């Protein structure tokens, strides 16, 4: 028995009798040592897959094929933007984002209070385009990521104008505009060049992202509620294109929608995609 435990045990890897050292060292002792970083390799692959955008909607296909090169072409025909990659493709690296606030919100359930996090994110390129996104999620990172996507989907054009003579580039709001959300009311008044943005911290950041250099603002209501404050400012900027001024009184020449203009391109793409599917089914 001693010889069995000594010689056989030594062969099996230790002096623990017949079981050897490590209990199953021959089968799983080197598990995971020579395989490399398992988890990180898969994550890297997912990141590379996410960078490649495969458009799903008609508008996305037109943008990816450079049939549409400006956001104004989308706004002119009031086309709904369903993919945030469209904004990334058209605006590019000039689009910046900032988290305005992250606040915990709670819901009373049978098991107790369920806490989630609500994120407010503003995006803009500083050249007449701004968006606002609000997202609630269990994790802060997920809420911020979702709010950025929603902010890109809600990007709207901001109309800029002059305070006096039309010299140089537009620098302020075209006229007095008012936005409201809840009890908060934000009013913007055109300002002469060089005045700067006279506003509180929250609307000032939104106006900077919108590309407005000079403006006077006044606010009323519970401006302590940051969510309503930033929504009222965004509503105010949306209304800059909500009225007609004398320069828009001219007779409008209507142009065809991009869907009608590039209908051959969209139809051929769809036919080729269906052909590939049917061929794959036939082979199977």
UniProtKB/Swiss-Prot annotation:
Residues 1-19 have a biased composition (Basic and acidic residues). Residues 95-158 form the S5 DRBM domain. Residues 20-29 have a biased composition (Gly residues). Keywords: Ribonucleoprotein, Ribosomal protein. It comes from the Eukaryota. GO terms for molecular function: mRNA binding; structural constituent of ribosome. PROSITE patterns: RIBOSOMAL_S5, S5_DSRBD. One of its GO terms (cellular component) is cytosolic small ribosomal subunit. The keyword Ribonucleoprotein applies. Signal peptide: none annotated. It holds the Pfam family Ribosomal_S5_C. Belongs to the universal ribosomal protein uS5 family. This is Small ribosomal subunit protein uS5z. The gene is RPS2A.
């Amino acid at each position: 028995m001693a010889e069995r435990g000594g010689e056989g045990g030594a062969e099996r890897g230790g002096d623990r009798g017949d079981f050897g050292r490590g209990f199953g060292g021959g089968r799983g002792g080197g598990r995971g040592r020579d395989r490399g970083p398992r988890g990180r390799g898969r994550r890297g692959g997912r990141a590379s897959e996410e960078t490649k955008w495969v458009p799903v909607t008609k508008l996305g296909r037109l943008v990816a094929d450079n049939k549409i090169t400006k956001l104004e072409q989308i706004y002119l025909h009031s086309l709904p933007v369903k993919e945030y990659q469209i904004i990334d493709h058209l605006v590019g690296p000039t689009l910046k984002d900032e988290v305005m606030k992250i606040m915990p919100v709670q819901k009373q359930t049978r098991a107790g209070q369920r806490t989630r996090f609500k994120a407010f994110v503003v995006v803009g390129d500083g050249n007449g385009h701004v968006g606002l996104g609000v997202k609630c999620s269990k994790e802060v990172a997920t809420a911020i990521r979702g709010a950025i996507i929603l902010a890109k989907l809600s990007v709207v054009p901001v109309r800029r104008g002059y305070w006096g003579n039309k010299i140089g580039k537009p620098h302020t709001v075209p006229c007095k505009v008012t936005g409201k959300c809840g009890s908060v009311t934000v009013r913007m008044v055109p300002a002469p060049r060089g005045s700067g943005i006279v506003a509180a911290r929250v609307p000032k950041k939104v106006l900077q992202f919108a590309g407005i250099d000079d403006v006077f603002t006044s606010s009323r209501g519970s401006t302590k509620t940051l969510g309503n404050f930033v929504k009222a400012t965004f509503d105010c900027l949306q209304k800059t294109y909500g009225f007609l001024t004398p320069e828009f009184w001219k007779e409008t020449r209507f142009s065809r929608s991009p869907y009608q203009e590039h209908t051959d391109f969209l139809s051929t793409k769809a036919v080729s995609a269906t052909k590939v599917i049917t061929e794959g089914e036939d082979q199977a």
